[in-house]
Structure formats: structure tokens, C-alpha cells
């Protein structure tokens, strides 16, 4: 899980090595993270078997867009997987995100169309070498926190370990995910805490997943709930999520405030 080496902003950027020379990438970060992400992929062999997108916020899909615009052909991508709502929905709900949707769709036009899989559905299984990826939902259209709640959740199973990525799912999206799946049956080992560790899914989602390890795509200021006035000065709910992880007995927390996080 990559930290933001370019700004202090939050992001979600994960590279999974499948062990057979291939990679799975989850989101990737901002446009200004492009060079770092690209170099990390190249250092790991340059072959992305599956690039998974949770939702089209700039801090998640910007880097992929600019890799396709500015570095097309420098790495191999076998498949890009995503579920977006209609352009008109983003235009109505969040014009800034609508701009990013248009931007990344423009980038999609530069690659072979057979690698684009924008039609993923709940329950679909994607094979990436020895890794098995389960799509847990299509983009939800909730009546609040619209774009975050449209996040696709994925479970990546590799070497006997199940990792659930929640993207930026918020409370109602998490409730819908619980309605759609028996989350306890997923046998989750590792969870990416939703929405950078605050104001994401509710406690019941984590309780059902019962992870032993938590991945925090959370910069220092957000971890500390620091709006510039010191620890605890902000309005973010990070401490609540930390408390949940303690209640659930999570025994390891990996956070990008400490730099790139490697789990082997």
C-alpha cells in the first residue's frame, strides 16, 4: 500500500504481487502520484494482470488516467475493472467527479477496448494468475454521500489470505453491502478501512468481516484528526474507527502515515 510521496493528501493506492510476475493494482491515487506509482509497477515487473477501480474520485483514479495518457505502452495491463454510474448521474451529484469521469474515460479510449471491463457485477470472479478476485457489488446509487457510496468492494484471495477492499463506501453503502452478502462467510483476514479510516462504513460491517489486520490509507493529519490546530482539533471520525479495530481485536494496523506499507 503506497503512501502519498507528492502531497499530504489522502489516497488509495495498492499493488499486490501475485508471485508469478504479475500484479494487481487497486485504484492508484492522484494524477500527481503518477510517476511514483508507475515506477513502483515497473520495478515489480511492469505487468498488471488486473487493475481494480473502486470509484472515480480523483484521489483514487487520477494516477491510472495519467499513466494511460502520458505513459501508454510503458507497462502491460491485461484488464481494467470498474463499475461507473451514468455520466448524467455524476454531473448531477458531483460536477468535480463528473470531470474526472470524463477524464479517465478519455484515457480509456487510448487502450485496446478488450481490456476494459466496465460491466462487472456482484459475485463475478476475476482470475489474475493465482489470485482470485471477487466483485462484491456494482456501483450503488444511494441517496447520500453519493460518490463514496458508489464504491465497488472487492475481495482478493491469494496464498490463503482474503483481503477486502472497501474503497470509500460510507454508512448506507456498507449497509447495502451487508444486505447483499453474508460478510462473515467471506472469511476476511485483511480489510482496507473505508474512506481513509473515517466516516466510512459502520461498525457492523467490520464486525461481520472480523479481520485480523487493517490497512489504513490515512495520512498523518487524518490519523491524528488534526486540522492544523493539533491532534484532535479536526472534525474527522478517525478515532471512532480506531476504537472499533480495538474492540474487534485487530492485531495489526498498517498505515500510510508511516510510509509505504509492505505485507509479505
Predicted regions and their residues:
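Binuclear metal-ion centers of metallo-dependent hydrolases, dominated by the metallo-beta-lactamase
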Residues: 74-148, 213, 218-264
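Active-site metal-binding motif and surrounding structural segment of the metallo-beta-lactamase
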Residues: 19-22, 31-82, 181-198, 210-215
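Solvent-exposed polar/charged
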Residues: 207-208, 247
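Core dinuclear metal-dependent hydrolase active-site scaffold
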Residues: 1-46, 113-185, 262-264
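Thr-Gly-centered strand-to-loop micro-motif
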Residues: 27, 166, 193-194, 217
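Short amphipathic alpha-helical segments
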Residues: 37-39, 64-66, 94, 177-179, ...
Amino acid at each position: 500500500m503506497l503512501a502519498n510521496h507528492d502531497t499530504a493528501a489522502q489516497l488509495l493506492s495498492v499493488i499486490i504481487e501475485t508471485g508469478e510476475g504479475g500484479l494487481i493494482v487497486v485504484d492508484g491515487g492522484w494524477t500527481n502520484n503518477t510517476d511514483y506509482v508507475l515506477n513502483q509497477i515497473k520495478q515489480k515487473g511492469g505487468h498488471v494482470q488486473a487493475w481494480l477501480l473502486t470509484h472515480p474520485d480523483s484521489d483514487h483514479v487520477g494516477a491510472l488516467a495519467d499513466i494511460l495518457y502520458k505513459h501508454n505502452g510503458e507497462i502491460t495491463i491485461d484488464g481494467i475493472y470498474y463499475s461507473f454510474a451514468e455520466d448524467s448521474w455524476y454531473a448531477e451529484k458531483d460536477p468535480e467527479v463528473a470531470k474526472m469521469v470524463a477524464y479517465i474515460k478519455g484515457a480509456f479510449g487510448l487502450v485496446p477496448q478488450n481490456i476494459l471491463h466496465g460491466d462487472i457485477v456482484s459475485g463475478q470472479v476475476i482470475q489474475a494468475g493465482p489470485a482470485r478476485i471477487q466483485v462484491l457489488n456494482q456501483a450503488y446509487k444511494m441517496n447520500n454521500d453519493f460518490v463514496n457510496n458508489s464504491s465497488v468492494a472487492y475481495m482478493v484471495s491469494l496464498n490463503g489470505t482474503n483481503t477486502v477492499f472497501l474503497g470509500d463506501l460510507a454508512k448506507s453503502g456498507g449497509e447495502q453491502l451487508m444486505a447483499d452478502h453474508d460478510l462473515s462467510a467471506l472469511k476476511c483476514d485483511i480489510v482496507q478501512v473505508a474512506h481513509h479510516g473515517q466516516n466510512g462504513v459502520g461498525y457492523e460491517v467490520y464486525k461481520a468481516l472480523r479481520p485480523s489486520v487493517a490497512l489504513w490509507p490515512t495520512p498523518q493529519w487524518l490519523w491524528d484528526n488534526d486540522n492544523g490546530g493539533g491532534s484532535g482539533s479536526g472534525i474527522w471520525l478517525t478515532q471512532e474507527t480506531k476504537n472499533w479495530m480495538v474492540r474487534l481485536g485487530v492485531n495489526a494496523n498498517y498505515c500510510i502515515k508511516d510510509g509505504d506499507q509492505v505485507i509479505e
